């Protein structure tokens, strides 16, 4: 593939494996499209797909998968720990190779317009594609979630960019946009107290005075009897993963709580992991040029 765009659509289904297979199917066996990864979480009740491709075939595959999700998912029956406003909650496009951010923005707008036309879904443009500053942050767009969107969408400042100014009865609304790569990173705590997880999340996220380029929320993992700080690092080159990990560790100590593990959702840029490994190993003057795989791929 000469020109590569990444797309990481998030679907509000993490439990029904048959539905998950049907949603992922449009990304398989397509010329110019490669399915890199998909992961589902039962507690979050969410599916995250990572796919790359040439802009046009990728667009077609994404539109097909959205159609399957709209058909299969009824948010009136959906329960999960992760905030959601749509059956297809968010569809970000990330320029990877020989594609500019401006081209990724244009692609996101093309997909958004077609989603509204084809599936009668209200579409909000967010991040780099946002039509207004207050729509850049996904959390602001999604505030109120599926249930609250029935009234929110009627407000003048929250009219959708494409589609009807009315929440879809079963599929809700969707956010589509272009952005830089982010790292979805979850840190698990050995406490069942959701209040503690909430408090730690508030302390580490930027909006609460914490780390720049860090979004965080507290999540309960009922099946394991623990809680989690669920994090999005929106620019890992400016705020490294290890900074989030260490700050969570510091804040957790105040409650006599420790970290029992962490996980990365979806794929992660090599540089983000190498940066973290270099920090904990105390490397001096280390660079990507010393990584064997990086040199081979040049």
Predicted features and spans:
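Long, contiguous binding/interaction regions
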Residues: 1-298
């Amino acid at each position: 593939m000469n020109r590569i765009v990444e797309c990481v659509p998030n679907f509000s289904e993490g439990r029904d494996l048959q539905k998950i297979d049907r949603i992922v199917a449009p990304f398989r066996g397509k010329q110019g499209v490669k399915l890199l990864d998909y992961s589902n979480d039962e507690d979050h009740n969410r599916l995250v797909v990572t796919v790359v491709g040439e802009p046009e075939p990728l667009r077609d595959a994404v539109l097909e998968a959205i159609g399957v999700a709209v058909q299969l998912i009824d948010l009136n029956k959906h329960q999960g720990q992760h905030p959601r406003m749509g059956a297809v909650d968010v569809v970000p496009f990330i320029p990877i190779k020989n594609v500019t951010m401006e081209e990724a923005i244009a692609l996101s707008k093309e997909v958004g317009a077609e989603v509204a036309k084809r599936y009668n879904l209200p579409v909000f443009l967010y991040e780099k594609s946002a039509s207004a500053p207050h729509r850049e942050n996904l959390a602001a767009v999604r505030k109120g979630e599926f249930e609250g969107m029935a009234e929110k969408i009627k407000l003048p400042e929250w009219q959708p960019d494409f589609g009807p100014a009315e929440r879809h009865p079963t599929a809700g609304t969707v956010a589509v946009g272009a952005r830089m790569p982010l790292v979805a990173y979850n840190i698990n705590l050995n406490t069942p107290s959701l209040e503690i997880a909430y408090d730690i999340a508030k302390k580490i996220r930027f909006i609460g005075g914490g780390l720049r380029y860090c979004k965080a929320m507290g999540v309960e993992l009922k099946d394991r009897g623990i809680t989690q700080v669920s994090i999005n690092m929106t620019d890992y080159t400016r705020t490294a993963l290890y900074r989030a990990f260490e700050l969570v560790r510091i804040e957790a100590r105040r409650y006599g709580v420790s970290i029992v593990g962490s996980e990365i959702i979806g794929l992660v840029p090599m540089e983000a992991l190498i940066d973290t490994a270099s920090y904990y190993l105390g490397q001096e003057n280390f660079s990507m040029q010393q990584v064997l795989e990086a040199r081979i791929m040049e």
